[in-house]
Amino acid sequence: MSDRVYLTRDGYNRLKDELHELLHVTRAEVLEKIAEARSHGDLSENAEYDAAREQQSQTEARIADLESKLSSATILDPKHIKTDKVYILTSVELLNLDDKKETLEYTLVSSEESDSDLGKISVRSPVGRALIGKAVGDKVTIIVPKGELHYEVKKIFVK
């Protein structure tokens, strides 16, 4: 049985669109590549055939992964997210306790929707794990590969 996957409606739709593309476009393209490579004769030393088979394997694995995630997905409605503590889909403003001038803002999302460029971090990341369950005023020590980071939760909200 798969772990429950928590997604926004947009995140769910993105995964669904990717699955549709893989099933109806990519899969057919890969099968064409395999057929073309087969037509070149001896498969034992056919790098084109090997590459196409590898692409097929990766495509089928991604299809299986997406089907599993979508079948176990729970779509979260931001309107029903509490802001008394840091939960998935909450945004949090942090004050850097080592440099009182620096503030950071993150939105906690599932690993399927994380995008550090947009400030969306996974609840499974070191930062996400450290923040889950914290309330405004709580101090947080986050252990990252570069060492320890010290923050205070200043604000919790939903975008």
UniProtKB/Swiss-Prot annotation:
Gene Ontology biological process terms, A to Z: DNA-templated transcription elongation; regulation of DNA-templated transcription elongation
Coiled-coil positions: 44-75
Matching Gene3D superfamilies: Transcription elongation factor, GreA/GreB, C-terminal domain (3.10.50.30), Transcription elongation factor, GreA/GreB, N-terminal domain (1.10.287.180)
The entry's keywords: Coiled coil, DNA-binding, Transcription, Transcription regulation
Gene Ontology molecular function: DNA binding; RNA polymerase binding
InterPro entries xref list: GreA/GreB_C_sf (IPR036953), TF_GreA/GreB_CS (IPR018151), Tscrpt_elong_fac_GreA (IPR006359), Tscrpt_elong_fac_GreA/B (IPR028624), Tscrpt_elong_fac_GreA/B_C (IPR001437), Tscrpt_elong_fac_GreA/B_fam (IPR023459), Tscrpt_elong_fac_GreA/B_N (IPR022691), Tscrpt_elong_fac_GreA/B_N_sf (IPR036805)
Function summary: Necessary for efficient RNA polymerase transcription elongation past template-encoded arresting sites. The arresting sites in DNA have the property of trapping a certain fraction of elongating RNA polymerases that pass through, resulting in locked ternary complexes. Cleavage of the nascent transcript by cleavage factors such as GreA or GreB allows the resumption of elongation from the new 3'terminus. GreA releases sequences of 2 to 3 nucleotides.
Family, per entry: Belongs to the GreA/GreB family.
Name the record gives this protein: Transcription elongation factor GreA
Organism: Chlorobium phaeovibrioides (strain DSM 265 / 1930) (Prosthecochloris vibrioformis (strain DSM 265))
Gene (name only): greA
